[in-house]
From Swiss-Prot:
Monomer. Belongs to the methylthiotransferase family. MiaB subfamily. It holds the Pfam family TRAM. It catalyses: N(6)-dimethylallyladenosine(37) in tRNA + (sulfur carrier)-SH + AH2 + 2 S-adenosyl-L-methionine = 2-methylsulfanyl-N(6)-dimethylallyladenosine(37) in tRNA + (sulfur carrier)-H + 5'-deoxyadenosine + L-methionine + A + S-adenosyl-L-homocysteine + 2 H(+). Its main location: cytoplasm. This is tRNA-2-methylthio-N(6)-dimethylallyladenosine synthase. The lineage of its organism: Bacteria, Pseudomonadati, Pseudomonadota, Alphaproteobacteria, Hyphomicrobiales. Residues 170-402 form the Radical SAM core domain. Binds 2 [4Fe-4S] clusters. One cluster is coordinated with 3 cysteines and an exchangeable S-adenosyl-L-methionine.
Length: 467
């Protein structure tokens, strides 16, 4: 998953102008797609309480920072942002006005009370498993409490979250995220997710189908199923049998209006036969798979507790490409894990050459407090990490540009997602996730049109519409 920083657009605003005394919320989202989804669901719960969204903290009554804890310096980024908000809160107080500040997400879960100690201006700390309690927590804040909600909830948070209004969902576009699984039981030694998101939990088929049908009814054409280990999803199917993600995808493909399906992020150990069959048989399932491996060295994979070997990963890729020859792969890589030798790194480079990725994320290892990796000796020098990362990224970039160039001359169906920057221009999404720019002023957002790729841009494709 990427670690972009986004904010929730003011999609919950009513069609009519809000009253002058309406409370406004600004939500800033750091991190992965699951945080984007979580921010939207928090916004939905606040909309039910009368809040409307704003695209700036300057006129917000409530500012929520939905945080990520995967990368190094996540906490420093948070406290820097809180420092800026403290000045804003002090200025409001001088004018007799209030600003409520909340911290949500994985840093909130990891640090809890420590956030209140370091940033006394914060009013609310709420973890990712308890944001269904957000309205109640805010009521307690208005009563004068400083609130920390980071206990893992016994109740199912999704059962307690209000469904977004149809007009609000429409404003979010024709592509949507849908969380189907949370948490992780793999305990990779470098990763904080099991400690911030908890153990693996799968949403019920009934919940997922109902939410997907609501999204489709609101005009959504493409669904991306989300989970920390999304292909670990399982549950009782409508036929009474135990379903895996493959069976779930077959069920969602039957929903009228849903034209494209995707899922992320996957673990190699959970790619089962039914899921591979879905890639073979479902035309709605896009030929793009994010399948992190982290290293090409068996020795490092063992130290990371990945519980598979490099050749097992390569054989899995071969199986998938045998049933879906046009499959494009993306991945995640960590360089400089404790004990990584030159040969270990060269093994990673060779695996990258063998797979030939369409796109991948790569990072220097940074120890995360509380993880087993943080206690390992034989740390790699920063200069060595830097040199290895540069080499790996150069190879991955070359593969990415080669993949984009291979699209030139190809014909494909593209889902139109939004107007482009130029008049009459539209931006769509290729089956392989790349943005596609088309000079077209007749079709509408949500239409699927047939195009030919004529050139490439920076991380995008340029296309002509075909009759």
């Amino acid at each position: 998953m990427s670690d972009d920083t986004t904010q929730i657009e003011p999609a919950m605003a009513q069609e009519t102008s809000p009253r002058a005394n309406t409370r406004k919320v600004f939500v800033k989202t750091y991190g992965c797609q699951m945080n984007v989804y979580d921010s939207q669901r928090m916004a939905d719960s606040l909309a039910a309480e009368g809040y409307v969204a704003t695209d700036t903290p300057d006129d917000a009554d409530l500012v929520l920072l939905n945080t990520c804890h995967i990368r190094e310096k996540a906490s420093e980024k948070l406290y820097s942002a809180l420092g800026r908000l403290r000045k804003m809160k002090d200025a409001r107080a001088a004018d007799g006005k209030e600003l409520t500040i909340g911290v949500a997400g994985c840093v909130a879960q990891a640090e809890g009370q420590e956030i209140l100690r370091r940033a006394p201006n914060v009013d609310l700390v709420i973890g990712p498993q308890t944001y269904h309690r957000l309205p109640n927590a805010l009521a307690r804040v208005r009563g004068g409490e400083k609130v920390v909600e980071t206990d893992y909830a016994i109740e199912d948070k999704f059962e307690h979250l209000p469904a977004p209004r149809r007009e609000e969902t429409r404003k979010r576009g024709v592509s949507a995220f849908l969380t189907v699984q949370e948490g992780c039981d793999k305990f990779c030694t470098f990763c904080v997710v099991p400690y911030t998101r908890g153990s693996e939990v799968s949403r019920s088929v009934k919940q997922i189908v109902a939410e997907a049908e609501r999204l489709a009814d609101s005009g959504v054409r493409e669904l991306t199923l989300l989970g920390q280990n999304v292909n670990a999803w399982h549950g009782e199917g409508e036929d009474g049998r135990e379903w895996g993600l493959g069976e779930l995808l077959f069920r969602l493909a039957r929903i009228p209006g849903i034209a494209h399906l995707r899922y992320t992020t996957s673990h190699p150990r959970d790619m089962d036969d039914s899921l591979i069959a879905a890639h073979r048989d479902l035309r709605q399932l896009m030929p793009y798979l994010h399948l992190p491996v982290q290293s090409g060295s068996d020795r490092i994979l063992k130290a990371m507790n990945r519980r598979h070997k490099a050749d097992e990963y390569l054989r899995l890729i071969e199986r998938i490409r045998n049933v879906r020859p046009d499959m494009a792969l993306s991945g995640d890589f960590i360089v400089g894990f404790p004990g990584e030798t030159d040969q270990d790194f060269e093994d990673t480079m060779q695996l990258v050459r063998d797979v030939n990725y369409a796109q991948a994320y790569s990072f220097k290892y940074s120890p995360r407090p509380g993880t087993p990796g943080a206690d390992l000796d034989d740390h790699v020098e920063e200069a060595v990490k830097d040199e290895r990362l540069q080499r790996l990224q150069a190879l991955l970039s070359a593969q990415q540009y080669a993949f984009q160039d291979s699209m030139i001359g190809r014909k494909m169906d593209v889902l139109l997602e939004k107007p482009g920057r130029e008049a009459g221009q539209m931006v769509g999404r290729s089956p392989w996730l790349l943005p596609v720019i088309i000079d077209d002023n007749k079709d509408r957002v949500g239409d699927i049109i047939h195009v030919k790729i004529v050139s490439t841009g920076t991380n995008s494709l340029i296309a002509q519409k075909l009759a």
